[in-house]
A protein has these predicted regions:
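Flexible "arm" and connector segments at domain edges
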Residues: 1-126
Length: 126
């Protein structure tokens, strides 16, 4: 008999899947503080797996853990989507693939001037 120790957050059906394979497992239900800590650890784990594979499966896992983190903090998925949409409206999304290279602070009469907005400030990244 061998025992492998995990001590990590798993999806809800994992214990049943393990038992249906003829193995047994020990699980416990976490309190709020411990759950949030394990969700944070799971976010790091899933992000690392996504960064290594760039697979849609790992991206979906990451999304699932983000949803769990939102719920653990008392937010609904609608709350998360509302804030995401507000930020996208106010600051944009990442659709244009812009890489900020540098910022020049131009001072004119004691006031910070704004750079012109438009396509002329966008160039290809080499």
């Amino acid at each position: 008999m061998s025992i492998k120790h995990y001590d990590k957050l798993v999806r809800d059906k994992i214990p049943q899947i393990i038992e249906s394979s003829g193995k047994s497992c020990t699980v416990c239900r976490l309190d709020d503080e411990s759950y949030l800590r394990k969700v944070d650890e799971k976010l790091q784990e899933e992000l690392a797996e996504y960064l290594e594979s760039h697979s849609i499966e790992e991206l979906a896992d990451l999304c699932e853990v983000v949803r769990a983190a939102a719920r653990a903090l008392g937010y609904t998925i609608d709350d998360l989507e509302r804030v995401r949409a507000e930020k996208a409206r106010a600051r944009g999304a990442f659709d244009e693939r812009l890489l900020l290279v540098d910022v020049v602070d131009v001072v004119d009469n004691g006031a910070i001037g704004d750079a012109p907005v438009g396509a002329d400030w966008v160039s290809s990244c080499d």
